[in-house]
């Protein structure tokens, strides 16, 4: 389950 707008970053 990823937030809408997830791409290649993490912990932003």
Swiss-Prot record:
Coiled coil (residue ranges): none
GO molecular function, one term: toxin activity
Subcellular location field: Secreted
Expression (tissue specificity): Expressed by the venom gland.
Taxonomic superkingdom: Eukaryota
Key words, A-Z: Hemostasis impairing toxin, Secreted, Toxin
GO terms for cellular component: extracellular region
Keyword check for Lipid biosynthesis: no
Role played: Inhibits coagulant activity in human plasma, possibly by interfering with one step of hemostasis (modulation of platelet aggregation, or coagulation cascade, for example). Does not show fibrinogen-clotting activity and does not inhibit ADP-induced platelet aggregation. Also does not show hemorrhagic activity in mice.
Family listed: Belongs to the snaclec family.
Name by which UniProt lists this protein: Snaclec uracolectin
Source organism of the structure: Crotalus vegrandis
